[in-house]
Amino acid sequence: MIINSISEFLQAADIKKQILGIDFGEKKVGVAISNIEHTVAMPLQTILATNQDRVNKIQEIAVAYNIGAIVIGLPFKLDGTETSQTHRVKDFANKLANKLLLPIFLCDERLTSKAANNLLKIGNIKRKVRNAIDDRVAASIILEGALKRMQNSKSYF
């Protein structure tokens, strides 16, 4: 089930379980995971696979970690308009929703990839390593933003 509002997401999610965060890209998909208390988002892995294989890999992760919900970053232009990548992410989210019986929250992800890259640069991480892990770091930034929105929501408590 695809969800666009944090209050609906909180009603649908099993908040006693960890949440998965996803930064979808054509070549790489970054994956992050929350702790059980939903206070921290941690980079988990980067998936390099085709569309259906990506869905299968995420399903494997969801089962292995007993995930209660998923957050997927939804890219927009700075002015809030959709891009071709926005539509690809929505298509991917629909495929994932058809495969998994978990609530999926589509969360605005403007500038998260840039923030992830800048964060890794500040840490003096070499470019080759940055390129290998930037998607999972972006996924953790996306998930962290959703976790903060959850904590700020009155329906969370």
Swiss-Prot record:
GO terms for biological process: rRNA 5'-end processing. The keyword Transmembrane does not apply. It comes from the Bacteria. Could be a nuclease involved in processing of the 5'-end of pre-16S rRNA. It is found in: Cytoplasm. SUPFAM superfamilies: Ribonuclease H-like (SSF53098). Keywords: Cytoplasm, Hydrolase, Nuclease, Ribosome biogenesis. This is Putative pre-16S rRNA nuclease. One of its GO terms (molecular function) is nuclease activity. Belongs to the YqgF nuclease family. Its EC number is 3.1.-.-. Its main location: cytoplasm. PANTHER family: POLYNUCLEOTIDYL TRANSFERASE, RIBONUCLEASE H-LIKE SUPERFAMILY PROTEIN (PTHR33317:SF4). It comes from Orientia tsutsugamushi (strain Boryong). CDD domains: YqgF. It holds the Pfam family RuvX. Coiled coil: none annotated. One of its GO terms (cellular component) is cytosol. The keyword Transmembrane does not apply.
